[in-house]
């Protein structure tokens, strides 16, 4: 309720104006890039990830249904959250994310949305299977058109 004044039926002059654009399924960006949504769960909250050609970005989840997993198979690059080693109510653990990455079979998976509790970058990367790595500040991923 911190910013509830923004959502009042009669807006107050000078407050931010929001144009809602609900997205679901497949849509095109203003630059004509096709994007597909992936419905995932963040504890009890439905959230979405995105697929851009053979690249997917799913960074706030702890559950993905079997039907939505199908959308994530055959990717070149998957970016997935892996918060820490210990269980968490709304995020994949390192072990859960690793198992999911193996199941989905992307050519390269990067884990992101990690806490300091996951361990040292170099140590964790040494534990991960080939094709799965921790993301890092400044990582750049080239996406095909």
What are these regions (language model features)?
Residues 1-58, 123-145:
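Binuclear metal-dependent hydrolase catalytic cores
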Residues 37-38, 58-60, 80, 111-112:
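Thr-Gly-centered strand-to-loop micro-motif
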Residues 44-46, 64-67:
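A short, acidic/glycine-rich surface segment
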Residues 56-63, 71:
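Well-ordered, non-transmembrane segments within structured domains
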Residues 65-145:
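Binuclear metal-ion centers of metallo-dependent hydrolases, dominated by the metallo-beta-lactamase
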């Amino acid at each position: 309720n911190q910013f509830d004044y923004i959502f009042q039926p009669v807006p107050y002059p000078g407050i931010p104006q929001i144009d809602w654009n609900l997205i679901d399924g497949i849509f095109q960006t203003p630059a004509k890039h096709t994007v597909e949504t992936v419905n995932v769960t963040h504890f009890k909250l439905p959230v979405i990830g995105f697929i851009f050609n053979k690249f997917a970005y799913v960074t706030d989840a702890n559950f993905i249904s079997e039907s939505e997993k199908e959308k994530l198979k055959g990717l070149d690059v998957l970016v997935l959250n892996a918060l820490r080693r210990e269980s968490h109510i709304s995020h994949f653990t390192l072990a859960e994310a690793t198992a999911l990455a193996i199941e989905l079979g992307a050519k390269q998976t990067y884990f992101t949305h990690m806490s300091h509790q996951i361990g040292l970058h170099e140590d964790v990367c040494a534990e991960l299977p080939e094709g799965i790595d921790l993301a890092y500040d400044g990582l750049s991923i080239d996406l095909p058109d």
